[in-house]
């Protein structure tokens, strides 16, 4: 690791002292990540009375792929380390089937976490979600499994499953549902429900809140699948498209703050 240090003084007097620090990792060997460490040994102190000063990080930029974009909540009290609390429920003619999302890890080098008997094991980076596309894959797998599960209970008018996609330009998600089976204008449409944890991830979809009292199989929110002019045809199937009204991606971030702690960081007047 090479370090390029530049300290400079802006403005007049000693009331505002700015220290610019740039640290670069020039490792081209593709080895394991190098810990960021700043260490400097000096024979004379920069400040004779450091207690007279207060320090703050005015601004910083951090380019790192190691910060997770989301960390799923895993269901406790069961043996599957990838089974989350987020569920999709499909209902047709009074029959219903609930399917939970399964987490797909991005870091295959992390050890498998302990079984979530009572708590979720967050001691490693196993649950660090690094891709929004992987979330869409989990959602779409849940839709496929829900369609198959419901069709085992009652013959469905169409076996083509809804699917969700992520728009990287708007950071909004789009739900696509086959018009001939899911349009709310049909006499007997297939209905889509999210449980509360699932809805919290995608809360800007048009939906109806059904509450908690006497609610079974995660039917807390019913998505509104009305016929509109937003359609797309894929493989001969006409899909209704439902857009999020605003992006909920910022709500997914598990990062609350980045804290700088140091008792040896010098300030140069």
Where are these regions (language model features)?
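Flexible assembly/topogenesis modules
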Residues: 1-269
